[in-house]
């Protein structure tokens, strides 16, 4: 394993590399209240993952390999492809005018009609 450290006037630098199969390494430098650096390791799939970071008044920010590993991401995508999908939404139907029944008693309504002889133009309805 390699390791180094430097301190000077409130600033520092350090780093290490394990040099083994885990591939762990780290480098960092900083001053009072802030730091920048990176670290690396070999994950369970054999992939080297490296993260760069900074920390200071704006908080901790990491970039690089900060998500899930590619094997887990591929397995999740395969599972999502097998998941049931919602059926497509039906097309909206055209509006239909409502059917409003007519009131009883208007001419032409259902019922019985009797035409009385001798009374021209008169019909009784009941």
From Swiss-Prot:
Domain Chitin-binding type R&R positions: 9-87
Organism superkingdom: Eukaryota
GO-annotated cellular components: chitin-based extracellular matrix
Record keyword Aminoacyl-tRNA synthetase present: no
GO molecular function: structural constituent of chitin-based larval cuticle
InterPro entries per UniProt: CHIT_BIND_RR_consensus, Cuticle_Struct_Prot, Insect_cuticle
Keyword annotations: Cuticle
Cysteines joined through disulfide linkages: none
Primary role: Component of the rigid cuticle of the spider.
Protein's recorded name: Adult-specific rigid cuticular protein 12.4
